[in-house]
Amino acid sequence: MKKMSKHIVLSFAVSSLLFSQAYALPQGGKFTHGTSGTIHTSGNTVTITGKGQNHVIQWGGGFNIGQNESVNFTTSGKNYLNIAYQKDASKIDGALNGGNNNIFLVNPMGVLIGKTGTITAGKFVASTTPLNDENVKTFLKQGASFSPAFDVSKQGNIINLGKINADNIVLIGNKVEIKKGKITLDVLKLEGNKVYVDAGVVKDTKNIVAKAEQEVIIQQSITSFEENGALLGNSSSKFSFDDSSKVKNWTKYGSIADATEWNKFADFLECK
């Protein structure tokens, strides 16, 4: 009996591992709402080619990209609305190669871009706001200019730890966090109940627009502080806030990570 139980446990563990590996790429994708195209999966790569200008893809098995895996949008200058159906946040640990296409990813449970995750696109939008048919029709009319409305009641978070390279980025969720990684773009729009930004991550951004219902925090390491000419939250000079008077808590602070940064901080105090 003991040997059998061990075999059952081992079999379950192996099957669970195989199941998780099998679903590390987007699953169950179908073009809907009158749009069309092809979705081809080969090994660790999904290739998507739309046949029109605006496309809607509903992913019945969720939208995730595992480490060392990739999703490639092969067209140029097109718009793709990806709607993920899953019980947890979409995890981007691999490569989302959008080229100069505009990529929208909607998952009410959230979107997590991991440390190994990379995204390239003309415009990238991640949102936790559920979309109804009227919203989708609006996307089909507006294309790249479409932006989901913020729903304060949804608890899904948008968190970035990876690298995003796009001309325009829009992140909408309960809590929007840009904690690590690198973001290179012209315009960054953040909207949520709470917005947390590491200023060092967005230092190359030309324009940042934030809207928060409850709290805004801009954090900056001492190293980044030094690189930005001893200006705390140098990127904050690029921030503009919608309805900023409604924000209950507004904070800017510098952080010290190790002994090297302590020394830099001490040198700064001596100079003062």
Feature roles, as predicted:
Residues 1-23:
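Gram-negative bacterial Sec-dependent N-terminal signal peptides
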Residues 8, 15, 221, 235-237, ...:
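N-terminal leader/targeting signatures
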Residues 10, 19-21, 227, 254-256, ...:
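Short, intrinsically disordered, low-complexity terminal segments
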Residues 257-271:
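Short, low-complexity, Pro/Ser/Thr/Gly-rich segments in the mature regions of secreted, periplasmic
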Residues 225, 239-241, 253, 265-268:
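Aromatic (phenylalanine/tyrosine) cluster motif
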Residues 21-243:
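Solvent-exposed adhesion/ligand-recognition segments of exported proteins
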